[in-house]
Regions:
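Acidic/His- and Gly-rich active-site-bordering loop/insert found
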Residues: 1-101, 106, 110-125
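Divalent metal-coordination and catalytic microenvironments
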Residues: 21, 61, 75, 105, ...
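Active-site beta-loop-alpha junctions enriched in small/polar residues
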Residues: 26, 78-80, 136, 166, ...
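Histidine/acidic-residue-rich, glycine-tolerant segments that coordinate divalent metal ions
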Residues: 60, 81-100, 106-107, 112, ...
Length: 387
């Protein structure tokens, strides 16, 4: 089954929805305008049930098929934007300063709406499709909020599927893998407390800058010497702040960064070693290191059987030559991981073509991907809910 003719027919309409959402970006849980737009469209499609306020501002639409099966699957799209100023020029560019859809969640929402429209028209499946529109993917754990609100139980969801666009991947292609596909994106901060002095009298100081520099160097040993080289981990220091002027050794310095891992054991190792290295180096130099470590999201782990189902649906749409079933994992993070911890499922990438990268002020979702995404969602739902 290639691209659905019906999906191709209303691609322009879905593109118009996408561009409308792009012009009205909202952040985290504050997606009231977007959620209202989604709810209105679902109502127009005549779906069976629309439930709002799940995970604060999330929406679930229920589409029942022709048969009597109680089986239900969930298809998820994220709705929130990013705190960026968009490079102007497009007629549908953001109308809200400091906010833009730089990760393609406008496209994700529009594609799932397109699939909902098609599924509500045809209902060529036996069971229930729950179309899930999630807030706060960008750092707000919106997926966890929806899970903790009892979404899976309320709608009887047995399997859950997600999709994300990928700049640099050709249009009309998909990519997926079994196991970890997205990393756990953790954060750490270190405060080094020493003793300040005049810069001309360094012997009277316990210099947090020199000590902090040693800590930064020591952290590189985690990936280079502590972790199994066959289990990927990234430890990146991204901020180092200290001092206010040129002739004073400050009393403290702050260091922060991120850890990315695809293995829970390596993740725990990195957390432990950051504390040991920072506290050990500081203590050896008569200073104190205070370490905070925040686990943001788990590793996004695709379940084997559901990954096979997702790949099969993609192959039916674009052909086997255009589906990479063993793509390299990404060290970016994704809170869909919480849904995959709650139910078996899979997360797939869809090609966005040669566009600016994600989280870039020049990025835009490629509307030419819409028909592929809508067709994938429809094919997946119909395959998983056959008699």
């Amino acid at each position: 089954m290639p691209i659905l003719n019906r999906a191709a027919e209303f691609q322009q309409e879905v593109s118009e929805w996408r561009r409308h959402l792009h012009a009205h970006p909202e952040l985290l849980y504050d997606v009231e305008y977007t959620a209202a737009f989604v709810a209105e469209k679902l109502k127009e499609f005549g779906i069976d049930e629309i439930v709002t306020g799940i995970g604060r501002t999330g929406i679930v639409g229920v589409i029942r098929g022709r048969g009597e099966s109680s089986r239900a699957i969930g298809l998820r799209a994220d709705m929130d934007a990013l705190p960026l100023d968009e490079i102007p020029g497009r007629p549908w560019a953001s109308t809200i300063p400091g906010k833009m859809h730089a990760c393609g969640h406008d496209g994700h929402t529009a594609m799932l709406l397109g699939a909902a429209k098609y599924l509500a028209e045809t209902r060529n499946f036996n069971g229930t499709v729950a179309v899930i529109f999630q807030p706060a993917e960008e750092g707000g754990r919106g997926a966890l909020a929806m899970v903790e609100d009892g979404m899976m139980e309320q709608f009887g969801i047995r399997e859950i599927y997600g999709m994300h666009n990928m700049p640099g991947m050709e249009l009309g292609t998909f990519a997926i893998r079994k196991g970890g596909i997205m990393a756990a994106p953790d954060k750490f901060s270190i405060t080094v407390r020493g003793r300040g002095s005049h810069a001309a009298e360094p012997h009277k100081a316990v210099d947090p800058i020199v000590i902090g520099a040693q800590i930064v160097g020591g952290l590189q040993l985690i990936a280079a010497r502590n972790a199994n080289p066959l289990r990927s981990v990234v430890v990146s220091v991204t901020q180092f702040h200290a001092g206010t002027t040129h002739n004073i050794i400050p009393e403290h310095a702050s260091i922060s960064g991120t850890v990315r891992s695809l293995d829970e054991g390596v993740r725990t190792l990195a957390e432990q070693r950051i504390a040991q290295i920072a506290e050990g180096i500081a203590g050896a130099n008569d200073a104190v290191a205070e370490v905070e470590y925040e686990r943001a999201c788990p590793v996004t782990v695709n379940h084997p059987e559901e990954t096979t189902h997702a790949a099969r649906a993609a192959i039916d749409v674009v052909g086997a030559a255009n589906v990479d079933t063993d793509v390299d994992a990404s060290m970016a993070g994704e809170d869909f991981a919480f849904m995959l911890q709650s139910r078996p499922g899979a997360y797939i990438m869809i090609g966005n073509g040669d566009t600016a990268g994600l989280h870039n002020p020049g990025y835009d979702f490629n509307d030419e991907a819409i028909a592929f995404g809508v067709s994938y969602w429809v094919r997946l739902a119909e395959q998983r809910l056959t008699d």
